[in-house]
Amino acid sequence: MVSLPKDRMRQLEKRFEIIESQMAKNPDSGTYVKLASEYADLQPIVTSIRTLNALSIEITELETIISDKLTDVEMRNLAQEELPPLFQKMEKLEKELQILLLPKDITDEKSAIIEIRAGTGGSEAALFVGDLFRMYERYANAYNWKVEVISLNEGEVGGYKEIIATISGKGVFSKLKFESGVHRVQRVPETETSGRIHTSAATVAVLPEAEEIDIEIRPEDIRIDTMRASGAGGQHVNTTDSAVRITHIPTGIMVVQAEKSQHQNRARALQILRARLFDIEQKKAESERSASRKNQVGSGDRSERIRTYNFPQGRVTDHRINLTLYKLDRILEGDLDELINALISDYQTALLTEMDGNG
């Protein structure tokens, strides 16, 4: 039997009933939106609680029939046959409910900023950055998420030395947060005549997109410098200083944006800075909460090698959970769900183990 927090379950069910009652009273639109959002969050949990309660009653009734010596033998035998599948169903439902009741990461529902940078491997690393960006872009398209490139630095023979983009939609960060780290590729470059396999790497950083209410940036904590933005061949693309560099003085974090519009550069640089500062804050809080826990999916350290893409063998291996899939082509086309769901499941298992240990 799975241990479930009965008091909390009752509180959630009561809260759900209160929300239902308040929504039925036709509140103003602002209040209704807030209630509807909380209702949507609670509905799957409360549905599972009610199904589990009904199942528990059904099992109790069957056990009463079985234990009653006055009950017809055939009826008792029938009840005995019905019990095992109900116990199996109950066990499955309890595990699902246990996952639903796990503490929510407040950043999970947020959009994300993804930063991909070439590591070791020169031109091959830049090409690999291009492959990774297209992979995430196709994955995002499958979920109808919006992808917008904030800045890019193209490689000499293709791909990108660096590319930064926003991926907007509900729950983006919950799906992509385990992608942060070093991704390694093993393949034979097109220019390699001897057929020798080269190893290159790229670093991925996935940050929850932060709103102004999430993180405050005080004007006195930043220094904004402007400079001329250069176009192709080093020519100035306009006559004004349009490139923007923002330095966060307390942390030393620096963000540069060099598109044509100075106003847009400033806004986007602040957007990236806000996300990086929020990410630091979240990681510090998580570190304090779980100093004793070592999650199997890894620490989220961006220097940690998390995954290898081996072209000759057509395989992708995630080193954090020792999962190898022989479908490299499909994964690079954006078929990431099997990998991502396995990482989420592993993380949830680690959380449950921690909760059991604390309990």
Swiss-Prot record:
PTM description: Methylated by PrmC. Methylation increases the termination efficiency of RF1.
Domain of life: Bacteria
Cell compartment(s), UniProt: Cytoplasm
Bridged cysteine pairs (disulfide): none
Gene3D superfamilies registered for this protein in UniProt: 3.30.160.20, 3.30.70.1660, 6.10.140.1950
The keyword DNA repair belongs to this UniProt entry's keyword annotation: no
Record-level Gene Ontology MF annotations: translation release factor activity, codon specific
Stretches for region Disordered: 284-311
Main location group: cytoplasm
Modified positions (N5-methylglutamine) in chain numbering: Q235
Record keywords: Cytoplasm, Methylation, Protein biosynthesis
Record-level GO cellular component terms: cytoplasm
InterPro entries per the UniProt record, alphabetical: PCRF (IPR005139), Pep_chain_release_fac_I (IPR000352), Pep_chain_release_fac_I_sf (IPR045853), Prokaryotic/Mito_RF (IPR050057), RF-1 (IPR004373)
Its job: Peptide chain release factor 1 directs the termination of translation in response to the peptide chain termination codons UAG and UAA.
NCBIfam families: prfA, PRK00591.1
Family: Belongs to the prokaryotic/mitochondrial release factor family.
Descriptive protein name: Peptide chain release factor 1
Source species: Bartonella quintana (strain Toulouse) (Rochalimaea quintana)
